[in-house]
Swiss-Prot record:
This is NAD(P)H-quinone oxidoreductase subunit 5, chloroplastic. Its EC number is 7.1.1.-. The gene is ndhF. Keywords: Chloroplast, Membrane, NAD, NADP, Plastid, Plastoquinone, Quinone, Thylakoid, Translocase, Transmembrane, Transmembrane helix, Transport. NDH is composed of at least 16 different subunits, 5 of which are encoded in the nucleus. GO terms for biological process: ATP synthesis coupled electron transport; electron transport coupled proton transport.
Length: 741
């Protein structure tokens, strides 16, 4: 066992040769490297599989009762200062390593087919391998210096991956937005590290925790300064894990390829912030203000992410806001003292969200030959629908991922989310009510996404999209329609004009531009043809295999944390796994409950989830297809004060969700413009005032010199006479005025 731990330092560097080989190959032999580009997927997957096996071995040893292992190598700079580098193997490290490698392998296998026709195929695999290296280095770090080094590398890789298609201006802006937003968090993290080194004199975790806890208990440190330093450390996690108010980069990060979105949202960048909070929780627990702040920002993010997902039409952006909300749950858990539930939900959400993102990539892949290769079309759920018969395997896997995220038993996220909800009742009833309500919203917007994508009919096939003639195609729009006639707001099932596109969960009708209309007309001319190439097709087996594997994880990974305490059985593997870390936090490690208590607690949360699914099915399902007479529907929808008031409320909710809660507008209006205004004011002051003074002195000196040079008439003797006269005058003034006072 000791032998295995000693060589754990190699874990982060195993995937690195792929990045180096691709870089050197493109530099030295670019033609041969590009001709053999498809071969690079094999070493990428193989090397990461080696890390997975190594991590699995370490995890088994941790579960069987091994203690925390730490290896340090000291680099002495002088007698007063030395840097220690090494690796730390504990339950948190082993959990994160397993998570990173398993999700990473599935994403790499998926990407081999998804990116096969992209010119940046080699660059993609180089970035992905380096991202895995950076994240593995982060989770095995034994001190804050290593954490910061790999933290910056993770941010750099995310910048490169989000801006992978950097020739697209929107992608270039998205990666810059992510980079700048995370600079705020990284700056706070660096200041926090320096502050804690000043307090404790150590950056190594064990010494840091022990010294800081002793100082807090003996009042050996200023509590305000300690709280400030802890807050700065937490700011780094807030930015990385897209917590309010530094969450604005996450939806725009969807401009990268879909496999990148799956990796970032499941196992790398957004997981890094949660990992940092879990790693530094022994510091945060002794500062109540920080724990309260963690739980507060967590619950705000939970609710905000769910509300912003309600009106999204882009399938990837909907999943992005879902990630934001679920990370809020994961951040809420450590804030309320539920360390185990936080890591449990991090695990279950990672596999479910990876499944959903890769499933969305399969959907996008099937839609691109029909609607074109623009993300505005291929990712638009308004143009989807009825995909069940075209992509049945993708549909089944996506449904299971959706049900898992909704919290439906026995899928993975049910077990972890239910534990967080139960613990939130013990912490604060207000927080618990918000968390439970958001569980219902999660079920609503996730099933909305599923129904718009797979149920009904393929929306783009209807002739009203082609512009050829009117149709009786009806769309559900609970937001109402914008127009001068009152009757337009009367219909829940509204007939769309031939130049208008269906706006699900939207209050507005958008005109279809000429290019889209021509594309749709081209499709409609082939509609009566038997050529099946114009229909969505199921993805290749290389893309379906990772989906099926992730389905297995989604089905069974929740079993590692089942908290049942039965005689002769021990289901709770996760608690055994986390025992050393829980003991370090001095918490009660007894998480077991009996069957009756568990079922009683679960009924409430599952009922809320089913209610959200029911509402989504009512509004977006096929229930309206049975009503052939619109008057039957309209008879239930009469214009009146209550109806108008309800419309106003719905429109307010829609505007809030569609406009991202106006947070981006606020930043653009006050922060960005304010900084630019300050920069312009500073530039004006520098050019007009500072430069004006210096240039004015120079110009004045020039003209004075030009004026007095004629006094001497051009003769040296005259210049000397004038010079000596002035010197004598100043000396006399100095003598009589200053010395005789």
């Amino acid at each position: 066992m000791e032998h295995t731990y000693q060589y754990a330092w190699i874990i982060p560097f195993v995937p690195l040769p792929v990045t180096m080989s691709i870089g050197l190959g493109l530099l030295l032999v670019p033609t041969a490297t590009k001709n053999l580009r498809r071969m690079w997927a094999f070493p990428s997957v193989s090397l990461l599989s080696i890390v997975m096996v190594f991590s699995a071995d370490l995890s088994i040893q941790q579960i069987n009762g091994s203690s925390i292992y730490q290896y340090l190598c000291s680099w002495t700079i002088n007698n007063d200062f030395s840097l220690e580098f090494g690796h730390l193997i504990d339950p948190l490290t082993s959990i994160m390593s397993i998570l990173i490698t398993t999700v990473g392998i599935m994403v790499l296998i998926y990407s081999d087919n998804y990116m096969s026709h992209d010119q940046g195929y080699l660059r993609f695999f180089a970035y992905m391998s380096f991202s895995n290296t950076s994240m593995l280095g982060l989770v095995t770090s034994s001190n804050l210096i290593q954490i910061h080094i790999f933290w910056e590398l993770v941010g750099m890789c995310s910048y490169l991956l989000i801006g992978f298609w950097f020739t697209r201006p929107i992608a270039a802006n998205a990666c810059q937005k992510a980079f700048v937003t995370n600079r705020v968090g990284d700056f706070g993290l660096l200041l926090g590290i320096l502050g804690f080194y000043w307090i404790t004199g150590s950056l190594e975790f064990r010494d840091l925790f022990e010294i800081f806890n002793n100082l807090i208990h003996t009042n050996g440190v200023n509590s305000l300064f300690a709280t400030l330093c802890a807050f700065l450390l937490f700011v780094g996690a807030v930015a990385k894990s897209a917590q309010f108010p530094l969450h604005v980069w996450l939806p725009d990060a969807m401009e990268g390829p879909t496999p990148i979105s799956a990796l970032i949202h499941a196992a790398t960048m957004v997981a890094a912030g949660i990992f940092l909070v879990a790693r530094l929780l022994p510091i945060f627990t002794v500062i109540p203000y920080i724990m309260n702040l963690i739980s507060l920002l967590g619950i705000i993010t939970v609710l905000l992410g769910a509300t912003l997902a309600l009106a999204q039409k882009d399938i990837k952006r909907s999943l992005a806001y879902s990630t934001m909300s679920q990370l809020g749950y994961t951040m809420l858990a450590p804030g309320i003292g539920s360390y185990r539930a936080a890591l449990f939900h991090l695990i279950t959400h990672a596999y479910s969200k990876a499944l959903l993102f890769l499933g969305s990539g399969s959907i996008i892949h099937s839609m691109e030959p029909i609607v074109g290769y623009s993300p505005d079309k291929s990712q638009n759920m308004v143009l989807m629908g009825g995909l069940t018969k075209y992509v049945p395997i993708t549909k089944t896997t996506f449904l299971l991922g959706t049900l898992s995220l909704c919290g439906i038993p026995p899928l993975a996220c049910f077990w972890s989310k239910d534990e967080i909800l139960n613990d939130s009742w013990l912490y604060s009833p207000i927080f618990a009510i918000i968390a439970c309500s958001t569980a219902g919203l999660t079920a609503f917007y996730m099933f909305r996404m599923y129904l718009l994508t797979f149920e009904g009919h393929l929306h783009i096939r209807f002739q009203n999209y082609s512009g050829t003639k009117n149709s009786s195609f009806c769309s559900i729009s609970i937001w109402g329609k914008e127009g001068p006639e009152p009757v337009k707001k009367k219909l829940l099932l509204s007939v769309m004009n031939n130049n208008q596109k269906v706006s699900f969960f939207s209050k507005k009708i958008y005109q279809i531009d000429g290019n889209v209309r021509n594309l749709m007309r081209s499709f409609s001319t082939h509609f009566d043809n038997k050529d099946t190439s114009m229909y969505p097709c199921e993805s290749d087996n290389t893309m379906l295999f990772p989906l099926l594997v992730l389905v297995l994880f989604t089905l069974f990974v929740g079993s590692i944390g089942i908290p049942f305490d039965q005689v002769g059985s021990d289901f709770d593997i996760l608690s055994k796994w986390l025992t050393p870390s829980i003991n370090l936090l001095h918490q009660n490690s007894n998480y077991s409950v009996d069957w009756y208590e568990f079922v009683t607690n679960a009924i409430y949360s599952v009922s809320i989830s089913y209610f959200g699914i029911f509402i989504a099915s009512l509004l977006y399902g096929s229930v309206y297809s049975s009503f052939q007479n619109l008057d039957l529907i309209n008879s239930f929808v009469k214009i009146g004060p209550k109806r108008l008031f309800l419309d106003r409320i719905i429109n307010v909710i829609y505007n809030w969700s569609y406009n991202r809660g106006y947070i981006d507008v606020f930043y653009a209006t006050f922060l960005t413009k304010g900084i630019r205004g300050l920069a312009e004011l500073t530039n004006f002051f520098d050019r007009r005032v500072i430069d004006g003074i210096t240039n004015g002195v120079g110009i004045a000196s020039f003209f004075v010199g030009e004026g007095i040079k004629y006094v001497g008439g051009g003769r040296i003797s005259s210049y000397l006479f004038v010079y000596l006269s002035y010197v004598s005058t100043f000396l006399l003034i100095y003598y009589f005025y200053f010395l005789n006072r």
